């Protein structure tokens, strides 16, 4: 009887992908706060991701290449927030021993566990790939010539990248065994799916850091050029706004036609020099953006490494690492859009009260939006 009960408990643990562990009765009370957190993330993430998808599909000005990758990530995050998180929250609120369908691993209960695990793996994989596509798109926009960018991100090429992200994620979900070892059997000395997940997260982090830190190194001239990135903190930093307002025609980057307009150039005081302000502002925004990714993904890297080598990991560390990674799915829309001027205008047209409140909060420090004509190229806002 003891062995049977232990096997059932272990099966429940493996079925929840180590998110709501039930290895001991003492953990039962701690599953309720975790379930409530998943419920909040599910509601907030579903609304935020759904709003971004609706805005981009409804407003022509938002239908750019960069936003296509953002919407792709929002669609993947929507599957996690709307389909997987509610199930995990409900299973955590059920009494111990009844959090799974009454069946063996090879029966209906096992199929249900694999389906939930596959749904989570598909959504998170596509979401992380979309983050990489957004970072690479912005890096090439800043560091390559407009003609090169336009040739690479043609409409059919962009559609191919989006389809490839889903195909790659689906192939990994179908071909690889579950992240957690199969319950009821002796754990292997090395569990390769967990190690592969850790390696993939490390590779994604390295790519993001390379792209965003490369942007900081390469962009040195114009505040307008940096504003193409739509970093979520750029429009609220006072140094950039003051420099742009006091010296609107000073030292802008030359357009594709050649030289800048020397008649408009004015000497700037050291405190408002655009290069110095731009380096400080872009560096801060990139640093915060990278910190969000590191905080959300690196704890899961270490948990995956420990699980891959069959090392014991405390329940609290497991739950916290998965919650942080899943929270990235709920915060993804805000991470890219909440300081974007075009998104704010679209939100004001859909939700006047919310949009007006957001506009009033940033009115004192907002930088005017930069049109494609001012940039001198369609690459920054290339439509689908």
Swiss-Prot record:
Tissue expr: Expressed predominantly in the striatum.
Topological domain spans for side Extracellular: 1-35, 95-116, 180-195, 307-310
Keyword Cytoplasm set for record: yes
Main location: membrane
Topology within the bilayer: Multi-pass membrane protein
Record-linked InterPro entries: GPCR_opsins, GPCR_Rhodpsn, GPCR_Rhodpsn_7TM
Entry GO CC: ciliary membrane; cilium; cytoplasm; nucleus; plasma membrane
Family: Belongs to the G-protein coupled receptor 1 family.
Record-level GO BP terms: adenylate cyclase-modulating G protein-coupled receptor signaling pathway; cellular response to light stimulus; G protein-coupled receptor signaling pathway; locomotory behavior; motor learning; neuromuscular process controlling balance; neuronal action potential; phototransduction
Glycosylation sites: 3
Signal peptide per UniProt: none
Cytoplasmic side, ranges: 57-73, 137-158, 217-285, 332-384
Effect ascribed to mutating residue 84 to A/I/L/V: Abolishes the responsiveness to synthetic agonist 2-PCCA
Annotated keywords: Cell membrane, Cell projection, Cytoplasm, G-protein coupled receptor, Glycoprotein, Intellectual disability, Membrane, Nucleus, Receptor, Transducer, Transmembrane, Transmembrane helix
Organism: Homo sapiens (Human)
MF term (GO), any: G protein-coupled photoreceptor activity
Protein name as catalogued: G protein-coupled receptor 88
TM segment ranges: 36-56, 74-94, 117-136, 159-179, 196-216, 286-306, 311-331
Disulfide bonds: none
UniProt disease annotation: Chorea, childhood-onset, with psychomotor retardation: An autosomal recessive neurodevelopmental disorder characterized by abnormal involuntary movements, marked speech delay, intellectual disability and learning difficulties.
